[in-house]
Amino acid sequence: MDNYEFSELLKTLKNKVGNIASIIKPENIQTRLKEIEELENSPSFWSDVKQAGIIGKEKTKITNLLKNYENAFNALNDANELFDLANSENDTETLEALFNDASKLEDTITSLEISMLLSGENDGKNAIVSIHPGAGGTESNDWASILYRMYLRFCEREGFKVETLDFQEGEEAGLKDVSFLVKGENAYGYLKAENGIHRLVRTSPFDSAGRRHTSFSSVMVSPELDDDIEIEIEEKDIRIDYYRASGAGGQHVNKTESAVRITHFPTGIVVQCQNDRSQHKNKATAFKMLKSRLYELELMKQQDSANTGEKSEIGWGHQIRSYVLFPYQQVKDNRSGEAFSQVDNILDGDIKKMIEGVLIALKAE
């Protein structure tokens, strides 16, 4: 990097921070924080625990947003001042240090962008994730299990907690279906970027001839709904099936029909839960999953999303990302246009940067 390149970078970052400031309006955030502080000092505030909790979450979110803005604003100002001073004194050592720290400065601005992008109504919620393999038998089932592991590792990296709601093992390898709840700050905000079809190209370990195979898996993500959000489900629109939960190798793990499957006829959505030994608890969780999916479906309709509705055919039509392991190694996201060569790292859960690139790209559209 040289003087000209760094100068252009500073201009770009200054424009970004300026645009973000015009959107989030830091002065309005400060005013709102003062209002919340006054509310908290009122004796009657804590009598409504539910409302206090809602306002508490709002306070945390906007405090973090303001903090990220101030960090970015101050870092950019400091870099500008130091750059001007170093140039006026022909201080090559300081200039070199600034050039070396350019990526850190960019990361600070990116953190602000992501903080702004994750300030939506549902972004802070927990996420319900379901993975379904496409046609292709064992190969597709294995691909679904690879994706499942990738998300588990991502959750570990981010400090998210995972609760498996339903898991159906594949006959030879992999899995037929999995649903899990991800708990943590902005879990849905991040994982909503994974909604869609994921394509794998590789030499199949299940093909004795060593041929190249293409597999697809569908990932569906919806926010875990708060109790105050009401989704009406009519009894005539659903069918509830009860069956015995199965474990590894298809063995039944208990003697009662504790597992629950709910089919929603108008949308074709099917959810199932076998996480608990209690049929009653599994039924309650399955209804929660269904409401979450219906809510997500409505959000997609409102946003006029290309991925509206159930993915009736898993294939090229709704593909969001390709993972190529052979004849070369690359992961490419169709929405951001970004390509990554560190395939092993990505499949080991290092997907945060890729997700952030998608969030920024979608916001720019």
From Swiss-Prot:
GO terms for molecular function: translation release factor activity, codon specific. Peptide chain release factor 2 directs the termination of translation in response to the peptide chain termination codons UGA and UAA. InterPro entries: PCRF (IPR005139), Pep_chain_release_fac_I (IPR000352), Pep_chain_release_fac_I_sf (IPR045853), PrfB (IPR004374). One of its GO terms (cellular component) is cytoplasm. The gene is prfB. It comes from Campylobacter jejuni subsp. jejuni serotype O:23/36 (strain 81-176). PANTHER family: CLASS I PEPTIDE CHAIN RELEASE FACTOR, PEPTIDE CHAIN RELEASE FACTOR 2. It is found in: Cytoplasm. Transmembrane segments: none annotated. Keywords: Cytoplasm, Methylation, Protein biosynthesis. Methylated by PrmC. Methylation increases the termination efficiency of RF2. SUPFAM superfamilies: Release factor. It holds the Pfam family RF-1. Belongs to the prokaryotic/mitochondrial release factor family. This is Peptide chain release factor 2. Its main location: cytoplasm. The modification N5-methylglutamine is found at residue 251.
